[in-house]
Amino acid sequence: AQDYVPGIYARIVNSAGNTNFTEAYGQVKYQLSPSLLVNLGLRAHHFGLRKEIMLENRAGLLWTLNNQHSLSFGYGKHSQPEDLNVYMIEVGGVAVNKDLKISEAHHFVLGYDWQLTDKLRFKAEGYFQYLWNIAGEEGTSYSLINLRRALYLNKKLVNNTEGRNYGIDLTLERFLADNYYYLITGSVFTSKYKAGHNVWCNTRYNKGFVLNALFGKEFYFANNRKVLDVNARVTITGGERYSPILESQSLAAKRVIFDESRAFSEQLRPLTYADLTVNYRINHRKSSSVFSFQMKNVLGAPIYIDHNYNYQTGQIELSKATLVIPNISYKIEF
């Protein structure tokens, strides 16, 4: 990996290792009454590196009020190991993270389902998640809860991070009928964490909201032998969070230095993504020909990567990429 000065390379990570991960899951379903359904589950897994068996209980309750309305409640205990290279890295020739515990979380969900018509449904879900034993660095705001890439991780970590996520999801869904369908979803949420700095603050992914709209329409020709279907999706999402940059220190050091005392207090602007898919099907006697055209990111929305120091301009810049991806395909179905 390249160090901060052009032409100078430094070894950041050089480690190797292996382990195993085994899991099993069981579920039972009880119909307590015609309107009350209970699901109970248990997941067990063994992480070879820690030689530890963990049990996770799950429960779900569905209460059907009538043909149109139902309520649901769900709980689950979840846990997962980090990427393997997190445990295998060496600092000063010592594998400093092999004793890290597995991250754990409690998930609670409360839902409401309203069948408005035989073609239209509304759903609302509220949720709360509490996370603990997440790995982070002692005395700083650094935590794997905000990690995007573990490739260059070379820090000694401890299980010092807590997190909490809560929000509400709303869905309006029209099933495919009369040759068209649509799906509209909206989410409002908050995501916070507390690491070694012992302060609750935003996670990187506390975007605040996400809106999605999906629409599809079918057109029939030639006695239904030919079908043209058009599908479009639009997503509007709040921007990712980032920590303020200490500009004078960064320019002097020729690398980005963040203000860890105000971790992830800044936010990038909201983004709008759009995808378009057009399929044209010709039904033959014993087969079908399908021509497809797909365009991802039609509006050319940028993908923000990270802040970096530009050696040519001597400035701190936000790196980004814009990918508009077309795809054309043809297939024959028998």
In which residue ranges do the predicted regions lie?
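Surface-exposed extracellular loop regions of Gram-negative outer-membrane beta-barrel proteins
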Residues: 3-4, 48-50, 68-108, 128-155, ...
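Residues that define the transmembrane beta-barrel architecture of outer-membrane proteins
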Residues: 18-22, 53-55, 104-108, 128, ...
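Residues on the lipid-exposed face of transmembrane beta-strands in outer-membrane beta-barrel proteins
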Residues: 24-30, 59-63, 110-114, 168-174, ...
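Repeated loop/turn-to-beta-strand initiation elements of outer-membrane beta-barrel proteins
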Residues: 35-38, 68-71, 119-122, 178-182, ...
